[in-house]
């Protein structure tokens, strides 16, 4: 059964309680989820690693936003988010620990709207903590609803 492209962020795109031994492994998991959602071609995952090697995608508040390079848009089938939570944290380098990865696949410039909405959410430290420590998918979907609405 193929995934239904029913929105920027769906329950199928949220994975809680994940584990990754490294930043590379976490980025790989993010990319593989985007592929399984039918949002990107497998080649997009390689560009996510390239982006991470050129500039960190760590955003702050324990959140990273893995995404591909500008040139990788050709591998994007539809704009989608994938959210992976790492309760034990992942070393993102430079003393930064990530507990939540919000992977972005954008066909155009939608990623700028997504980043803007995400920044507003993370500026609220209570919401940021709620997001990092979420125990169920619905909580994540509710907290990230403002981002999902940027698709409309």
What is each PLM-predicted segment?
Residues 1-152:
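Cytosolic covalent-transfer regions centered on His/Cys nucleophiles
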């Amino acid at each position: 059964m193929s995934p239904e492209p029913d929105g920027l962020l769906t329950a199928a795109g949220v994975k809680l309680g994940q584990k990754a031994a490294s930043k590379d492994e976490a980025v790989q998991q993010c990319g593989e989820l985007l592929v399984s959602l039918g949002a990107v071609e497998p080649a997009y995952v390689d560009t996510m690693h390239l982006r991470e090697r050129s500039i960190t995608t760590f955003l702050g508040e324990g959140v990273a936003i893995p995404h591909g390079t500008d040139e990788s848009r050709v591998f994007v089938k539809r704009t989608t988010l994938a959210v992976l939570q790492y309760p034990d944290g992942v070393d993102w380098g430079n003393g930064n620990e990530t507990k939540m990865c919000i992977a972005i696949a954008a066909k155009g410039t939608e990623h700028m709207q997504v980043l803007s909405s995400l920044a507003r959410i993370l500026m609220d430290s209570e919401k940021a903590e709620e997001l990092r420590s979420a125990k169920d998918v619905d909580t994540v979907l509710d907290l990230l609803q403002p981002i999902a609405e940027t698709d409309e």
